[in-house]
């Protein structure tokens, strides 16, 4: 498996952009899917996108947001690239109690990545030994890398 992680600083985002173009959760989805599609296309592979359920209305809105990405693309990726890379034009949403392996892994690694990114980027001392070890493993072999081997902006994306 490979990992793409996005963290958004909502306070900084609100300061910088008075009017939000997206719901922050949907903005993160767009960035995640962009990176995933770019990576899949660079490896000549196809894949699927799944999210953990947040509830009826939220799930519907997230699925609609994904459908718009698939049909309209983004500022950086044409819709055809989404079609080549993704096996489905619909976001799969599953409840936590289904214990989907990929969603469980995402839950396990999200916090260590967040702590490492905020510790590094915001210069806080909020890291822990276990989380740092998890992050090091991810950095060595799991985070998606760009064409020049860079993780920042590819496997890790910090959004203001």
What are these regions (language model features)?
Residues 1-160:
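Phosphate-ester processing/binding pockets and catalytic centers
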